[in-house]
Swiss-Prot record:
One of its GO terms (molecular function) is ATP binding. HAMAP family: GatA (MF_00120). Belongs to the amidase family. GatA subfamily. It catalyses: L-glutamyl-tRNA(Gln) + L-glutamine + ATP + H2O = L-glutaminyl-tRNA(Gln) + L-glutamate + ADP + phosphate + H(+). Allows the formation of correctly charged Gln-tRNA(Gln) through the transamidation of misacylated Glu-tRNA(Gln) in organisms which lack glutaminyl-tRNA synthetase. The reaction takes place in the presence of glutamine and ATP through an activated gamma-phospho-Glu-tRNA(Gln). This is Glutamyl-tRNA(Gln) amidotransferase subunit A.
Length: 488
């Protein structure tokens, strides 16, 4: 018997009542992973021995009835440090790297007796939108194995969508949680920048990166955020704001809530069928008592260009540490120090990572800094101001998560610009440091469509309130792919 259809609260009740043990739940989860892994390829590492050892220790001391997450398995994206468990960032550069410390988000999960079951596949160093740039494997969409799962947190999304695990962690720099959540029909949240500590997250774009949760439902997503969110002295960008309970508004009605619908989010490049689906969702919010009105975010159209200058510039700096000296891959054909650096980085990084390092280095160079990096920062400020103006009058912003549904494997990986444009609607949220969620909102051609809700900083509770209200009157989150046990 599989437990992957049980909610976290249902699993907790079974564990407290001793109808199952943490060890049994872990064993069943490992079986679910193994039985589906060949089809979807969600994991780089499955930490079976460590997970069973941890489960046995939890059983020995007993399940804490007041701790919802006690004994619950968790999958973790492979750019989040896990002590003693390979953390590769899906790169040849770190193919053998075992951290000697846990990321704060992982330490918080361990503190709640969660069980790290394995590390999920991703785009190399989180650079990509399809999980095809991984050094190890290509992950496949849970609904259609000929399609991409999205990225860069593709493995974390498919692990939940396919029923391998109930909960997982990802990271989001320009849409890397929300886009794969949309493509796989699960709930994915990018928290406000600083809400979850970045300590232990392998850095890509330091002013953009944020760790966040995946789950099948809105409430379970909020329950996992309760675990991982914390202020942290080890992260200088950690926010001092701490919400006591992110589930506190779930179940409340949304009558009187004011929701903005940017006209740019239904503009050029958006699939007409996606437009229909999202407009229907807007009508549903109106039926629930909210007001939905059209607004403008005029500078959002520059988001992709701004993002790829800023993110690539930050990446070119952050990735300088990978040089073959301290840890990870080192080229064995080097005759001197210069060759160690050049050969290691040439052989250790994949094409997309090298592309972004070169773009970032160019943008930061003395002759082009003002024209590119400085200008991108100025336009970023305009994007932030656009959001501020809207949130002066509205509680939330609504729109599609992605311009289209999941695309085919190997169709865009040789067209970087087309791949980058898949994040057109998610990138501005990262540039502004705002919270955003993707929830299931329907299907187009048999593939899931994600609805994105964006809030002002630290408005996760309100986002969850609105998302849960929509979820309560729809059944999209209940529909499951065949690999999970559904009929689609």
């Amino acid at each position: 018997m599989s437990f992957n259809h049980k909610t976290i609260e249902e699993l907790h009740d079974l564990l407290v009542a001793k109808e199952i043990s943490a060890t049994e739940l872990t064993q069943k989860t490992l079986e679910d992973i193994k039985s589906r892994e060949e089809a979807v390829g969600s994991f780089i590492t499955v930490s079976e021995e460590a997970a069973l050892k941890q489960a046995a220790a939890i059983d020995a001391k007993g399940i804490d009835a007041d701790n919802l997450m006690s004994g619950i398995p968790l999958a973790v994206k492979d750019n989040i440090s896990t002590k003693g468990i390979l953390t590769t960032a899906a790169s040849k550069m770190l193919y053998n790297y075992e951290p000697i410390f846990d990321a704060t988000s992982v330490a918080n999960a361990y503190a709640k007796d969660m069980i790290v079951i394995g590390k999920t596949n991703m785009d190399e160093f989180a650079m990509g939108g399809s999980t095809e740039t991984s050094y190890f494997k290509k992950t496949k969409n849970a609904w259609d194995h000929t399609k991409v799962p999205g990225g860069s947190s593709g493995g974390s999304a498919t692990a939940v969508a396919s029923g391998q695990v109930r909960l997982s962690l990802g990271s989001d720099t320009g849409g890397s949680i929300r886009q794969p959540a949309a493509f796989n029909g699960v709930v994915g949240l990018k928290p406000t920048y600083g809400t979850v500590s970045r300590y232990g997250l392998i850095a890509f774009g330091s002013s953009l990166d944020q760790i966040g949760p995946f789950a099948p439902t809105v409430k379970e997503n909020a329950q996992l955020l309760n675990v991982i969110a914390s202020s942290d002295v080890k992260d200088a960008t950690s926010a001092p704001v701490r919400i006591a309970d992110y589930t506190s508004k779930i179940g409340r009605d949304i009558k009187g809530m004011k929701i903005a619908f940017p006209k740019e989010y239904l503009g050029e490049g958006i699939d007409p069928k996606i437009k229909e689906t999202v407009l229907a969702a807007a009508k549903q919010f109106e039926a629930l008592g909210a007001t939905v009105e059209e607004v403008s975010l005029p500078h959002s159209k520059y988001g992709v260009a701004v993002y790829y200058i800023i993110a690539s510039s930050e990446a070119s700096s952050n990735l300088q540490r990978f040089d073959g000296i301290r840890y990870g891959f080192r080229a064995d054909d080097a005759k001197n120090l210069d060759e160690i650096y050049v050969n290691t980085r040439s052989q250790g990084f994949g094409d997309e990572v090298k592309r972004r390092i070169m773009l970032g280095t160019f943008s930061l160079s003395s002759g082009y800094y003002d024209a590119y990096f400085k200008k991108a920062g100025q336009v970023r400020t305009l994007i932030i101001e656009d959001f501020d103006k809207v949130f002066a009058d509205y509680d939330l912003i609504l729109g599609p998560t992605t311009p289209a549904v999941a695309f085919g494997l190997d169709t865009l990986n040789h067209d970087p610009v087309a791949m980058y444009l898949a994040d057109l609607l998610t990138i501005p949220v990262n540039l502004a440091g705002l919270p955003g969620i993707s929830i299931p909102a329907g299907f187009v051609d048999g593939l899931p469509v994600g609805l994105q809700l964006i809030g002002p900083k630290y408005a996760e509770e309100t986002i969850y309130q609105a998302a849960a209200a929509f979820e309560a009157v729809t059944d999209y989150h209940k529909q499951q792919p065949i690999i999970f046990g559904g009929d689609k």
